[in-house]
């Protein structure tokens, strides 16, 4: 059995286990063999865990054969696993294989894309689209031409030869190149000479646009002919519309200045017609005359005493003469007449309807408090 070849410490551990389980001679012997085998593999794992940290990074040297770890002794030497006489014979091949595998993977990841062959690089270029616009491709083709001019077929040929991506499908990018040639102002069409045999016109770069192409990149945004023509039409319309607008703007002050007096006159007419219409209406005249007569009768009734009546009569007659004398002075504008239409009738103390009808315009500019009349001369709104 394998227990004969075990060290003394393993035998003592096995005997101690045998003493703890006294179940029978046969069961004890089987348990001892099982424990001996278990302790053997346990010691192998222990040695492996203690031995692994002893290896440094420098020990993992790259092998000569990158596939050596597949054909190493861990695969071919299977007898070391079957026979347990040398426990280190099983673990050493695994270390060799692990070292070789790690070195291979580290060397693989550290390199660049140099592992790709030339054929694989060409295949990659066929898949990846070049980072150039169609206008940039056309410009590169024309600039690399000896005479700085190419036909459409020659542009196709240059793009297909220098960029393998466009060799797969020709329909899509050829249409795009034709559209860019016709819509971009930087490409000019040059007619073919009579002595030059062949078909199709030449295409050249505009001298003003040569600086716009820098290493295949177009520096500014292309403008279409339709956009440029529409912009020119807008500018022409704007230039034509500016003098017309200026003329209208110049005439507007001259039109407003004569019309402003007319508007003022119309407003004055509106303001003046309202008092004139009120004074000319007989109904309102009769109303105001009746109100003044009621005022005079009420004043006479309230002041029935002799002295008070005389004073009131003197005041009324004096004020009546004052108002009749002051009426002759046209001091108040007619615009303030409409503001006093809502005043009550007790503000006026005229004694006769003749004065009311004759000097009705002054009636709206006077008011009386306690039978005293004051003229509102120079009043402003």
UniProtKB/Swiss-Prot annotation:
Residues 129-223 bind DNA. GO terms for biological process: anatomical structure morphogenesis; cell differentiation; positive regulation of DNA-templated transcription; regulation of transcription by RNA polymerase II. One of its GO terms (molecular function) is DNA-binding transcription factor activity, RNA polymerase II-specific. Pfam families: Forkhead. It is found in: Nucleus. Gene3D superfamilies: Winged helix-like DNA-binding domain superfamily/Winged helix DNA-binding domain (1.10.10.10). Detected at stage 14 (late gastrula) in a horseshoe-shaped ring surrounding the neural plate. In neurula stage embryos, expressed in the neuroectoderm and pre-somitogenic mesoderm with expression in the outer rim of the neural crest and neural plate at stage 17. Subsequently expressed at different levels in a subset of placodes, excluding the otic and posterior lateral line placodes. In tailbud stages, expressed in neural crest cells that originate from the rhombencephalon and migrate to the ventral part to form the hyoid and anterior branchial arches. It comes from the Eukaryota. Probable transcription factor. This is Forkhead box protein I1c. The gene is foxi1c.
